[in-house]
Amino acid sequence: LNGSLNLWGSGRPIREFLWGEDMADASVYVMEHIDFDQLKGDNPEVRNCHINIGSGREATIAQVAEMVKNAVGFKGEIHWDSSKPDGTMRKLTDVSKLHALGWRHRVELEDGIPALYKWYLEH
C-alpha cells in the first residue's frame, strides 16, 4: 500500500464521530430511561426537549485520515487539495444533556477505525 492519496480540502475541519452501535445504544437508552415530560417540566411553552446524541469528542479530518492510514497500513503520502472546499470548519454536538441523563459513548474513534477495518477484512 504505497503511492499517494489526494483528499479534498485542508484537513483542518473538525468533526465529531460516533460508533454506530453507540448510536443504537444511546437511542435505546433514551427510549427506555427518559420521560420527555420531565425534560420540559411544568412549563408547556418549553420546546427544548431534544437530546443530541454524539461522542462530544472532536477530531480534524487530517487526524482521521492518519488514523485510517495507520489502520490499513498505507505507507504512501496524503496530499491535501486546498482547491477543493473544506465545508463547515467545525461540527460538534452539545451532548451535555445526554451526559447529565446518564449515557456516554463507549467506543473511541481511535479504537473504532481499526475495529471497522478488521470487520471489513473478515466480511
Predicted regions and their residues:
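C-terminal substrate-binding subdomain of Rossmann-fold SDR/epimerase-dehydratase oxidoreductases
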Residues: L1-H123
